[in-house]
Amino acid sequence: MKKIVLTLINFYRKYISPSKPPTCRFTPTCSAYTFEAVQRFGVFKGLLLGTWRILRCNPFNKGGYDPVPEEFKLLRRNTK
């Protein structure tokens, strides 16, 4: 299952994404983030993290650098 999901993400990144203007507000891009999250945490947790990232990728969020967390946490708390 993991290999299928990663193949689908790669298909999107190679064939669909280049035909669209860049809109991702984050680094790494949402597709790269989801790919890494699935690799690191498996299909279920990786897709949860990827979906949460895509939901945050909108004009109301400033975006910026947002790497895949070292540990699985769906919600992060600011430590400031």
Curated annotation (Swiss-Prot):
It is found in: Cell inner membrane. The keyword Protein biosynthesis does not apply. SMART domains: Haemolytic. Keywords: Cell inner membrane, Cell membrane, Membrane. InterPro entries: Membr_insert_effic_factor_YidD (IPR002696). GO terms for cellular component: plasma membrane. The keyword DNA-binding does not apply. Its main location: membrane. It is a peripheral membrane protein. This is Putative membrane protein insertion efficiency factor. It comes from Kosmotoga olearia (strain ATCC BAA-1733 / DSM 21960 / TBF 19.5.1). The lineage of its organism: Bacteria, Thermotogati, Thermotogota, Thermotogae, Kosmotogales.
